[in-house]
Amino acid sequence: MLKEIRGKSAKNLRGRSFLKLLDFTTDEIRYLLDLSKNFKDMKRAGIPHRYLEGKNIVLLFEKTSTRTRCSFEVAGYDLGMGVTYLDPNSSQMGHKESIEDTARVLGRMYDGIEYRGFSQELVETLAEYSGVPVWNGLTDLFHPTQMLADLLTIEEKFGYLKGLKFTYMGDARNNVANSLMIACVKMGMHFTACSPKHLFPTEDLVAEAKKIAAQTGGSVTLTENVSEGTKGAHVLYTDIWVSMGEPDSVWEERIKLLKPYQVNKAAMDNADKDAIFLHCLPSFHDLKTTKGQEINKKFGLPEMEVTNEVFESHKSVVFDEAENRMHTIKAVMYATMC
């Protein structure tokens, strides 16, 4: 079964850290997606796959999460591993102990480390000093595990990735947009960032993405025009307008800037007839959260980055996407540890 689950696209990723997709080739990403599909099939068929029995991992969370934590924990248990969760109050990392020292201690006790927090530099340091695979659960710059789930979901719906038109609407300089741009061009897709100009991705990252696109047949387009940006798109994707850790004072400015970039019926109608909608979640698409109620009371906006009509429509595959976090994270841990 081990040989079978690796598949024909198998690559040797043992000992590698998963910090950003820029570190991985198209073929390596393809292997992780194929492996994810195999694990998903096994999970649904009820076939045990405790291939990492006896190993232990630690999850370091400086930012809270539902999907990332649950995905790593369930994936870890399914693979037979022991899982330790540490929140900001449970470790001395960066406060009374340096990142380098913490990394070396954890590397002696655990076989793998997940980090979700603010600093990309911090997760890179953990990888450098721990001596074990480190997985980026999210930083302010990149969100690579989310990208694998997104790619898997898109491929499940269309049957392929290369050549598809992908449009991200909203704050295109955030970690999700950065990662999506790289993920799309790595797989030969056509990525469009549809946002206000001063929220475009950085010039350096765009240049890097275009360099990759030239090799894979993909492309990168930046536009402020919603009609142009969504026309014929196979995938429309958005994220909340204020990132984790940003103060509430940012909301007013961001809402004013991004309201024209809301994913609504008009945007979906302008996209390809078979277009799908993705969102990494959580989403402010109704008034069923305290934060959503606060925003509506202050700004008179019952729906934010996506309308409830689109979110609840048959074109929305956000819960398939959320489930796929677990399968893809399982693939990453297996590939880098076994």
Curated annotation (Swiss-Prot):
It catalyses: carbamoyl phosphate + L-ornithine = L-citrulline + phosphate + H(+). It is found in: Cytoplasm. Keywords: Arginine metabolism, Cytoplasm, Transferase. Pathway: Amino-acid degradation; L-arginine degradation via ADI pathway; carbamoyl phosphate from L-arginine: step 2/2. Its main location: cytoplasm. L-ornithine binds at N175, D239, S243, M244. Its EC number is 2.1.3.3. The keyword Isomerase does not apply. GO terms for cellular component: cytoplasm. GO terms for molecular function: amino acid binding; ornithine carbamoyltransferase activity. It comes from the Bacteria. Carbamoyl phosphate binds at S65, T66, R67, T68, Q92, R116, H143, P144, T145, Q146, C280, L281, R325. GO terms for biological process: arginine biosynthetic process via ornithine; arginine catabolic process to ornithine; citrulline biosynthetic process. InterPro entries: Asp/Orn_carbamoyltranf_P-bd (IPR006132), Asp/Orn_carbamoylTrfase (IPR006130), Asp/Orn_carbamoylTrfase_sf (IPR036901), Asp_carbamoyltransf_Asp/Orn-bd (IPR006131), Orn/put_carbamltrans (IPR002292), OTCase_ArgI (IPR024904). It holds the Pfam family OTCace. Reversibly catalyzes the transfer of the carbamoyl group from carbamoyl phosphate (CP) to the N(epsilon) atom of ornithine (ORN) to produce L-citrulline. HAMAP family: OTCase (MF_01109). Belongs to the aspartate/ornithine carbamoyltransferase superfamily. OTCase family. This is Ornithine carbamoyltransferase, catabolic. It comes from Treponema denticola (strain ATCC 35405 / DSM 14222 / CIP 103919 / JCM 8153 / KCTC 15104). The gene is arcB.
